[in-house]
Amino acid sequence: MEKSYVKFETPEDVSQKALDLVESAFRSGKIKKGTNEVIKSIERGESKLVVIAEDVNPPEVVYYLPSLCEDKKVPYVYVKKKADLGSKVGIASAASVSIVDYGKNEELYKSIVSAVEQLKK
């Protein structure tokens, strides 16, 4: 079933890059997990990239995130499963994660943002 908050289809390779970046940023302690923390990081201008799971139920939990990201000019990307996203940040599942600092992964970050920009055209 198509989720109303999924605004574009993210290719598998881009989703995997996003998961790799989340895992790396988590190891350096520079992420926010949980929708409330993610929203705060976006509103404070701290977020570099938001990763949103496509299988969130109820969808209202993350429904507002894509619009907020667009308003605040924060790139965002989707991954298929919240369990995959959660496993990268040490919890069972995560509806969304905000990367506050991507550390030494600038090239990976730029490749994700570039791919997302192309998808939204």
UniProtKB/Swiss-Prot annotation:
Gene3D superfamilies: 3.30.1330.30. One of its GO terms (biological process) is ribosome biogenesis. Its main location: cytoplasm. One of its GO terms (molecular function) is ribonuclease P activity. It is found in: Cytoplasm. Part of the 50S ribosomal subunit. Probably part of the RNase P complex. HAMAP family: Ribosomal_eL8. Multifunctional RNA-binding protein that recognizes the K-turn motif in ribosomal RNA, the RNA component of RNase P, box H/ACA, box C/D and box C'/D' sRNAs. This is Large ribosomal subunit protein eL8. The gene is rpl7ae.
